[in-house]
UniProtKB/Swiss-Prot annotation:
Interacts with CCA1, LHY, REV4 and REV8, but not with PRR7 or PRR9. It comes from Arabidopsis thaliana. It is found in: Nucleus. GO terms for biological process: circadian regulation of gene expression; entrainment of circadian clock; regulation of DNA-templated transcription. The lineage of its organism: Eukaryota, Viridiplantae, Streptophyta, Embryophyta, Tracheophyta. Expressed in roots, stems, leaves, seedlings, cotyledons, inflorescences and siliques. Highest expression in root tips, young leaves and vasculatur tissues. Disruption phenotype: No differences in hypocotyl length when grown in complete darkness, but longer hypocotyls in plants under continuous white or red light. Lengthened circadian cycle. Keywords: Activator, Biological rhythms, Nucleus, Transcription, Transcription regulation. The gene is LNK2. Residues 602-629 have a biased composition (Basic and acidic residues). This is Protein LNK2. Residues 528-549, 590-663 are annotated as: Disordered.
Length: 663
């Protein structure tokens, strides 16, 4: 009895009930098997109709190399609703419920296909073993055959003919083609689970049918409520306006959202793959992307690259931020599935478009409104998304920027003011140290400069503080000279003033100053040489005779018209170079022999520069007298070339010039 029950259970599960000619069994057992076989055939006839429907819809859902998926890279968007067969009302109760349950289970199982792990496969196999022992043979056999080997049982293009196939020989032959009889243990079934990824996921659909059927009635109520809500609002273009293709697209989105909330998965923003997959459902075959939503809402909604280009619009409130974020993230993949959400702030566009008060995306008008800048902004308006019109308005309200030339002039004036302030502070600092008498002498000297020594036509501004003209072309050319940092030392201040004054002079005055500097440098070198020779030991008499002779020849023969006394220009340049009023106190404190500084200060204390130049004239005469001695000796024939007539004539000329200088 135990062996018979085990064999009967094996025949029920694996379908191993084929007859053989050499097998003999008792009549009673044979009759019971025939009765059971007839019952199995009757149940198979009804079960095969539902199985055929499941096969057809499952093949339609899979992304295989089918004929309807070759042209379209995306799956059919309305496979969950619009692919229902037009059956009669008599069998709609049973067939439609099973068919809808299967479709809903496949829609809900879409995300599960991409989240399978090794542990999940083990749980599926354990669940399958439980279902093998609990399900009846016919139901289990039909479901497993349909889910594991759908390509063998479904044929595309037959349509409703699949529902009426009830050939017993064909059914038995199909079982033989599947090699179902070759599976003899649970190890073979386990190997079947391990072979294919899609097979394990398909078995999970069978387990999810029972949970989906319970919520199917609730989904139908939501769909009916949505249809009633859409019919309450007037639509442009179509009065009754819901097409048979646009409704399933919305239903698919609702079901996917409900499944995601039921499973506790992350939001749409955290799963871009699921969002892109749901966006693909809105694409209809043979129509553009904008057609379903244009028929549903009566206006065209901008698609890709529309989230970042909607200008002159009010920002949505906090309640619609999710819809705007989803539209920004799904840029280039289709329209947002939150279009049914009413929003009064998004409906009021910047151009007064009130054709659709329930649009989540504002319509961009082709003509700019002239009073855009006068509109009131919502409190949640983001200043970072200001439009080009507002930016232009702000730019016109702001003052014009400074040109590079104006910036340069401003920088130069600032540096000049800093230099003058530094000079004034320096003078004030040293003026407290100088006695009152010395300060009065210094002021008298400074007052005598422009009156007695300076040519008022050319050099009247040498001692005055320079005035700066921003429009001067010379200052613009010399603007690089003023870019350096201001030095607090008096030497730099004097040099700065000298450069500024020279920049205002003409070419003739500059040439005179250049010649004066050259002559002053030459006279300084001569004085330095004279002082060195007077305090040093003379090595030979020949050197003392040759050097003055060569200098005298160069001075009197080459430059016969050179002035004996310096001109006012030379004196003015010398005063600008060497005059330091704050060194008077230090010069008075110096003890010992008279130094060049004390001699200069002594001449400056007299107050007028003609008196100051008397000492220089005396020194020049002394130098001339020293040069006359060698010249006289040369005239008497002491020179080696005394025999030549040319040298004698030169000596005579030099002697005569020396006599004139003495007179």
């Amino acid at each position: 009895m135990f062996d018979w029950e085990e064999e009967e259970l094996t025949n029920m599960i694996w379908g191993d009930d084929a007859e053989t000619g050499d097998h003999i069994v008792p009549f009673k057992v044979r009759s019971e098997q025939l009765n059971k076989k007839e019952q199995i055939e009757e149940s198979k006839t009804a079960e095969q109709k539902i199985t055929g429907t499941k096969i057809d819809l499952h093949d339609k859902n899979l992304g295989s190399s089918s004929s309807h998926n070759v042209d379209e890279g995306l799956p059919q968007p309305d496979f969950c609703m619009s692919s229902w067969p037009d059956t009669s009302l008599t069998n709609a109760t049973k067939v439609d419920q099973d068919l809808s349950a299967t479709e809903l289970s496949k829609c809900l199982a879409e995300p599960v296909r991409y989240d399978s792990t090794r542990g999940g496969a083990f749980l599926l196999k354990q669940s399958c073993f439980t279902w093998v022992r609990s399900f009846q043979s016919n139901h289990f056999k039909s479901c497993v055959l349909t889910l594991f080997l759908p390509e063998k049982t479904s044929e595309l293009g037959k349509g409703p003919d699949i529902f009426h196939s009830s050939d017993e020989s064909k059914e038995q032959g199909d079982f033989d083609d599947y090699s179902w009889a070759n599976i003899g243990s649970f190890d073979d079934l386990d190997r079947m689970f391990s072979d294919g990824f899609a097979a394990m996921m398909s078995l999970y659909l069978v387990m999810a049918v029972s949970a989906v059927v319970m919520s199917y009635g609730h989904l139908l109520k939501i769909t009916e409520f949505e249809q009633q809500e859409n019919q309450q609002f007037p639509l442009t273009g179509k009065a009754n306006g819901l097409s048979s293709q646009s409704v399933p697209s919305v239903r698919v989105t609702l079901k996917a959202d409900q499944y995601r909330e039921h499973k506790g998965q992350p939001s749409v923003e955290d799963q871009p793959y699921q969002q892109n997959k749901m966006m693909k459902f809105s694409k209809m075959p043979g129509t553009s992307e904008a057609r379903p939503f244009q028929e549903l809402y009566g206006q065209r909604i901008p698609f890709s690259n529309s989230a970042g280009k909607c200008v002159n619009q009010l920002a949505p409130p906090q309640s619609s931020l999710m819809a705007v974020n989803l539209l920004s993230e799904s840029e280039g993949s289709g329209t947002s599935h939150y279009s049914h959400m009413p929003n009064q702030y998004m409906a009021n566009s910047a151009f007064g478009n009130l054709a659709n008060p329930y649009s989540s995306v504002p319509v961009i008008s082709a003509v700019q409104h002239p009073d855009v800048r006068n509109q009131l902004m919502h409190p949640s308006y983001n200043p970072a998304t200001a439009t080009s019109v507002n930016m232009a308005t702000d730019a016109s309200a702001r003052p014009s920027t400074m040109t590079p030339q104006e910036k340069l002039e401003k920088l130069r004036r600032r540096q000049q003011m800093q230099a003058m302030l530094a000079i004034q502070r320096q003078q004030q600092q040293f003026s407290h140290q100088v006695p009152v008498a010395d300060q009065s002498i210094t002021q008298n000297c400074l007052q005598d400069i422009p009156l007695q020594l300076v040519d008022k036509t050319n050099l009247q501004g040498l001692t005055a503080m320079p005035s700066f003209d921003p429009s001067s072309s010379l200052e613009q050319d010399d603007s690089g000279k003023f870019a350096a940092a201001v030095d607090n030392s008096a030497e730099f201040a004097v040099l700065y003033r000298l450069q500024d004054v020279v920049a205002k002079l003409d070419m003739g005055t500059r040439t005179c100053i250049r010649d004066s500097l050259f002559r002053l440098a030459g006279s300084a070198a001569q004085r330095h040489y004279t002082s060195d020779t007077s305090h040093s030991n003379k090595t030979s008499q020949d050197d003392q005779e040759v050097i003055p002779r060569e200098e005298s020849r160069y001075r009197y023969a080459g430059m016969p018209d050179t002035e004996a006394v310096t001109n006012p220009t030379d004196r003015t340049v010398a005063h600008l170079l060497f005059h330091r009023p704050f060194d008077m106190l230090a010069a008075k404190r110096m003890e010992g022999p008279e130094s060049p500084a004390s001699s200069k200060m002594g001449t400056e204390e007299k107050g007028n520069f003609p008196k100051c130049s008397i000492r220089e004239t005396h020194l020049t005469k002394q130098k001339a007298q020293k040069e006359e001695g060698p010249a006289d000796s040369l005239a008497l024939g002491n020179a080696p070339n005394s025999g030549s007539s040319s040298t004698v004539g030169e000596r005579v000329v030099e002697a005569s010039q020396g006599n004139k200088r003495k007179l």
